[in-house]
């Protein structure tokens, strides 16, 4: 316990006590702005500074005029004295020691940057541009270049910004506390872009916390380092007006959307095994997706994260594109390049939880600030991570502003929101007694619901054309319905039931499929209850599950035929499409983030055939309105053959107003069938627009010679078809 100051120790040096000097020197003073810098006195102006290592200090105006010499009042570098100024203004100190001389622009002689309106909007949770005010931003203040820093730490006793620019000394740039909001801020003159920095925080109980990265940092160091980095504002010259206007004007549910899911660190690598830069990715990935016919690229999280095997899902920097692939400007160039050729860019976004790394958000100011204090609410047992406190206004604002930031600054086309089910249920992955009911005694996380509704409302309200997609694995109602109709407000939802049932079916031996016919028909009972995306994602090809081709039943020929028929089934089925990288050419091995995809497989005809099929499926899906314009509406689907269990044959019709219908027929046993009758809506010639058994795709080349004749036999219209083995065909009327 500290000894109380006696009267001798309280003796003043000028207007400052020895105790105050000691508090500044030891980093325990919470408001150095009251002591340091330029101050007006009855006799004029005086200046005080703390410059460790200095023996002499003189004071200059910013334009270099000498205005006074300061007296050393403490040998550790404390100086004060009268200065010749006519008005209060920032000053620069010239410090000397032996033969060394250096200049220090006084951060304590500048006023605050944030204003009362910032405080007002922060308090009520309606500040929608926090990304321009919080964190580190370049600023020219009173003619001086520097960076403004701001961080939320309401329970801290003291917060300093430390970095390369002050030798990581927490006594040099102690921040100003705005008590109405709990935000600390400082303008640090002469700090330039590219400096590593963190926040040094003295907790509520006086304990010095581990140095914290900036929650709003727009750039970070490459792992294993974990400091934030001062970054210039983005100056990307955007050339994507046509792309953005298109998506802002259309009904996304009626557009073809085919998503290529990519892990940026392992799609391709350089020959030495290092990551491609954003510019290298742009030069290879964008043309590849254009050729393949995908409409969107969806990246697994590219926000800063310390641990490669987390794939980015345990992020410590929601506002910073990871340094693994270069600077943020590189990512902006990638998005711009994709938009110029009409490809959208989606980001996998993780607002459900955050890792407990000591430099991150956990226990940020010495209290449970971003997370719940009670582990029954604030700890995720599946991932050993912390759960955001969605009921706290500042936390909700942090996350919502992040969603807006990616749309605003990087022109992203949408966010796929990870682990929504874990956000919606208080008892998610918890046993009895391990969770706290809501105010009505239920298991629904009402705070999370309000957060998701507000996030979606603001994203769609401020950025027309941007979409949000929920990864939600339960039957929570109205996930993709508007908020004003009682929904969560997402644009789309992943159809996990489709993925589970269809993978189960196609992994079965064909001889057993007749007993599991409902696995492919049941999904149509709920296919239009949400706006669905059909996901064959990274989750299905990791953790011992095997790749998609490896999941298929049978010998190698049957595996390829099964996967081709499965892709044909999926691209003909109502819903938007998503396919994880490597599965388009039937990579045999499971995905690993440690290296590139097995691109060498493309030299083999069966693998190259699979890639050609996916390409042609995308082009067919995009060019035939019947296959996409009613993906989310029941009037665009009709069964033609639904109950042929014995032969494992399925057929349905896809339609759109004013467009030619497309019939999709799947023969899911290895039996070649001739003269198989399928009812069709109109008589006449129907063209075979796609056949997954074509030789060009690696199939046996069986089919209908390019067309069939539908005849009207007494009011019943249909055609006798050849059904290739383990294949999907698509037909379209010629007229």
UniProtKB/Swiss-Prot annotation:
Class in the EC hierarchy, top level: transferase
Keyword Calcium recorded: no
Catalytic reactions on record: Transfers a segment of a (1->4)-alpha-D-glucan chain to a primary hydroxy group in a similar glucan chain
Pfam family of the protein (one): CBM_48
Keywords of the record: Carbohydrate metabolism, Glycogen biosynthesis, Glycogen metabolism, Glycosyltransferase, Transferase
Catalytic residue positions: 418, 471
Stored Gene3D superfamilies: Glycosidases, Golgi alpha-mannosidase II, Immunoglobulins
A single cellular component GO annotation: cytosol
GO molecular function: 1,4-alpha-glucan branching enzyme activity; cation binding; hydrolase activity, hydrolyzing O-glycosyl compounds
InterPro entries linked: A-amylase/branching_C, Branching_enzy, GlgB, GlgB_N, GlgB_N_E_set_prok, Glyco_hydro_13_cat_dom, Glyco_hydro_13_N, Glyco_hydro_b
GO biological process, one term: glycogen biosynthetic process
E.C. designation(s): 2.4.1.18
Pathways per UniProt: Glycan biosynthesis; glycogen biosynthesis
Domain of life the protein comes from: Bacteria
Subunit structure: Monomer.
HAMAP family: GlgB (MF_00685)
Similarity comment: Belongs to the glycosyl hydrolase 13 family. GlgB subfamily.
Described purpose of this protein according to its UniProt entry: Catalyzes the formation of the alpha-1,6-glucosidic linkages in glycogen by scission of a 1,4-alpha-linked oligosaccharide from growing alpha-1,4-glucan chains and the subsequent attachment of the oligosaccharide to the alpha-1,6 position.
Name listed for the protein in its UniProt record: 1,4-alpha-glucan branching enzyme GlgB
Taxonomic source organism: Agrobacterium fabrum (strain C58 / ATCC 33970) (Agrobacterium tumefaciens (strain C58))
Lineage: Bacteria, Pseudomonadati, Pseudomonadota, Alphaproteobacteria, Hyphomicrobiales
């Amino acid at each position: 316990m500290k000894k109380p100051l006696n009267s001798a120790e309280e003796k003043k040096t000028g207007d400052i006590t020895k105790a105050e000097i000691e508090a500044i020197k030891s980093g325990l003073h919470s408001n150095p702005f009251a002591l340091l810098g330029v101050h007006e006195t009855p006799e004029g102006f005086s200046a005080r500074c703390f410059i460790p290592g200095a023996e002499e200090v003189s004071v200059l105006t910013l334009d270099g005029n000498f205005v006074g010499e300061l007296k050393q009042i403490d040998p550790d570098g404390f100086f004060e004295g009268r200065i010749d100024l006519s008005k209060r203004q920032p000053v620069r100190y010239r410090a000397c020691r032996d033969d060394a001389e250096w200049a220090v622009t006084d951060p304590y002689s500048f006023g605050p940057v944030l204003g009362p309106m910032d405080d007002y909007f922060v308090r009520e949770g309606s500040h929608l541009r926090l990304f321009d005010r919080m964190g580190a931003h370049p600023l020219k203040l009173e003619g001086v270049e520097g960076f403004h820093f701001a961080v939320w730490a309401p329970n801290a006793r003291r917060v300093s910004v430390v970095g390369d620019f002050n030798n990581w000394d927490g006594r040099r740039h102690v921040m100003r506390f705005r008590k109405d909001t709990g935000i600390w801020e400082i303008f640090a003159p002469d700090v330039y872009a590219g400096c590593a920095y963190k926040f040094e925080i003295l907790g509520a109980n006086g304990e010095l916390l581990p140095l914290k990265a900036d929650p709003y940092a727009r750039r970070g160091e490459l792992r294993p380092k974990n400091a934030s980095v001062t970054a210039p504002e983005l100056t990307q010259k955007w050339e994507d007006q046509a792309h953005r206007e298109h998506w802002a004007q259309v009904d996304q549910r009626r557009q073809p959307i085919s998503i290529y899911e990519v892990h940026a660190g392992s799609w391709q690598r350089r020959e030495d095994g290092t990551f491609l830069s954003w510019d290298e990715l742009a030069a290879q990935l964008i043309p590849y997706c254009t050729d393949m016919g995908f409409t969107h690229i969806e990246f697994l999280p590219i926000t800063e994260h310390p641990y490669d095997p987390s794939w980015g899902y345990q992020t410590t920097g929601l506002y910073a594109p990871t340094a693994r692939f270069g600077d943020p400007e590189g990512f902006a160039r990638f998005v711009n390049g994709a938009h110029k050729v009409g490809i959208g860019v989606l980001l996998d976004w993780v607002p459900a939880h955050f890792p407990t790394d000591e430099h991150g958000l956990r226990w940020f100011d010495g209290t449970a600030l971003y997370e719940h204090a009670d582990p029954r609410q604030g700890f995720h047992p599946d991932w050993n991570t912390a759960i955001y406190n969605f009921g706290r206004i500042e936390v909700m604002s942090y996350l919502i502003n992040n969603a807006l930031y990616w749309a605003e600054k990087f022109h992203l086309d949408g966010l796929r929101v990870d682990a929504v089910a874990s956000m919606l249920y208080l008892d998610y992955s918890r046993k009895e007694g391990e969770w706290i009911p809501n105010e009505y005694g239920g298991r629904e996380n009402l705070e999370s619901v309000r957060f998701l509704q507000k996030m979606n409302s603001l994203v769609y309200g401020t950025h027309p054309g941007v979409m949000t997609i929920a990864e939600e694995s339960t039957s929570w109602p109205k996930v993709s319905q508007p908020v004003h109709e009682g929904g969560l407000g997402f644009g789309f939802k992943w159809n996990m039931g489709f993925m589970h049932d269809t993978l189960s079916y196609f992994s079965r031996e064909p001889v057993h499929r007749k007993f599991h016919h409902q696995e492919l028909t049941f999904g149509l009972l709920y296919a239009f209850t949400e706006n669905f995306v059909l996901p064959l994602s990274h989750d299905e090809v990791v953790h011992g599950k095997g790749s998609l081709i490896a999941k298929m039943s049978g010998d190698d020929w049957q595996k390829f035929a099964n996967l081709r028929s499965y892709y044909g089934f999926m691209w003909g089925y109502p819903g938007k499409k998503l396919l994880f990288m490597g599965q388009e050419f039937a990579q045999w091995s499971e995905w690993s983030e440690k290296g590139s995809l097995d691109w060498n497989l493309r030299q083999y005809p069966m693998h190259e055939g699979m890639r050609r099929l996916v390409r042609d499926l995308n082009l067919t899906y995009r060019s035939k309105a019947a296959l996409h314009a009613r993906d989310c509406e029941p009037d665009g689907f009709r069964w033609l053959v639904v109950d042929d269990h014995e032969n494992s044959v399925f057929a349905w019709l896809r339609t759109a107003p004013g467009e030619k219908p497309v019939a999709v027929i799947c023969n899911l046993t290895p039996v070649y069938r001739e003269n198989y009758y399928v009812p069709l809506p109109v008589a006449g010639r129907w063209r075979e627009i796609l056949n997954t058994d074509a030789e060009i795709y690696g199939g046996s080349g069986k089919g209908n010679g390019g067309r069939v004749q539908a005849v009207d036999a007494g009011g019943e219209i249909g055609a006798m078809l050849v059904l290739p083995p383990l294949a999907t065909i698509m037909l379209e009327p010629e007229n």
